[in-house]
């Protein structure tokens, strides 16, 4: 039977003072808390760098799943790669997702909001020295004209080393969101084995994205995407969750720390399937208003 979070559960999780969470031993994830977002993302950028360095020493390939946001950690990673001459020739990057228009077609590749590939070309690959950069054929994007490619390649390579993941307010990772339909149901097992696919973006995610960037102009956010599925991401040896967005994410971090796997918050699947799940967050995001006295005025 699928697990459902009760009001009692979520109210209790949100009531804990954030300081008390640091010493708890019953969390589903390993917790790394910093004073602010900058420190948090600097730690993540250094963690990325150290993984590549270690695998290069052992002459091993490195296999990642990367998001097109957040991007703060890439500043640290890119600076170290360029300054320390760290080769990325053995790095394979599976990109999480790409926006599609309302007819399910990709947008032109460019440094625009609608083009996640263009965003990564500009903010990531375009800032790395050519002689150190990831080879083009090792930059794997989900494509509507070859939808099984990423899944088949991931299996051929033996799975992922680390998923570096932002997390949505309702627990999305990539655009793997809670399935919502009155007419069909997906089991937790099916979701955990989900492949690369084309999806409609949930309405509340469109609201969140539009608030963040477009003054809550919903129509400015693309309504569809192509996303890698959990089959690729849950093949990882490690998942690093990067959540330092403040008020929008104060509840989802509590859910990630305490909940059993539930389709309502897909991020909760990671602790069940991935051996090492680390939540990097800051004090503001880890705090919660329900852990303080709340009045109506």
What are these model-derived regions, one by one?
Residues 1-64, 82:
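N-terminal glycine-/serine-/threonine-rich phosphate-binding loop
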Residues 2-6, 11, 28, 34-35, ...:
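ATP/nucleoside-binding phosphotransfer catalytic cores, i.e., glycine-rich phosphate-binding loops
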Residues 151-152, 173-187, 251-256, 291-292:
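A short secondary-structure junction signal
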Residues 77-88, 110-111, 178-188, 259:
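A glycine- and small-aliphatic-rich helix-loop capping segment at beta-alpha/alpha-beta transitions
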Residues 9-32, 39, 86-164, 220, ...:
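Ligand-binding beta-strand-loop-alpha-helix segment within the catalytic cores
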């Amino acid at each position: 039977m699928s697990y459902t979070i009760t009001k009692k559960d979520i109210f209790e999780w949100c009531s804990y003072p954030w300081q008390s969470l640091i010493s708890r031993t019953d969390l589903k994830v390993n917790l790394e808390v910093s004073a602010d977002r900058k420190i948090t993302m600097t730690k993540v950028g250094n963690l990325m760098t150290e993984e590549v360095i270690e695998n290069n020493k052992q002459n091993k390939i490195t296999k990642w799943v990367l998001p097109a946001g957040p991007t703060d950690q890439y500043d640290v990673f890119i600076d170290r790669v360029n300054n320390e001459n760290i080769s990325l020739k053995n790095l394979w990057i599976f990109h999480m997702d790409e926006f599609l228009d309302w007819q399910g077609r990709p947008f032109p590749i460019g440094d625009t909001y609608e083009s996640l590939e263009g965003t990564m070309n500009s903010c990531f690959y375009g800032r790395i020295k050519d002689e150190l950069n990831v080879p083009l054929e090792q930059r794997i994007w989900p494509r509507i004209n070859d939808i099984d490619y990423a899944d088949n390649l991931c299996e051929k390579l033996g799975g992922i080393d680390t998923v570096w993941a932002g997390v949505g307010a309702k627990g999305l990772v990539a655009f793997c969101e809670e399935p919502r339909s009155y007419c069909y149901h997906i089991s937790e097992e099916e979701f955990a084995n989900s492949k690369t696919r084309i999806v409609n973006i949930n309405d509340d995610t469109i609201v969140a994205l539009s608030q963040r960037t477009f003054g809550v102009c919903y129509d400015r956010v693309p309504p569809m995407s192509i996303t890698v599925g959990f089959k690729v991401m849950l093949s990882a040896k490690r998942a690093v969750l990067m959540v330092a967005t403040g008020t929008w994410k104060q509840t989802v971090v509590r859910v990630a720390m305490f909940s059993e796997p539930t389709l309502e918050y897909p991020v909760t699947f990671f602790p069940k399937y991935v051996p090492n799940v680390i939540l990097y967050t800051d004090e503001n995001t880890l705090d919660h208003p329900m852990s303080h006295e709340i009045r109506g005025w």
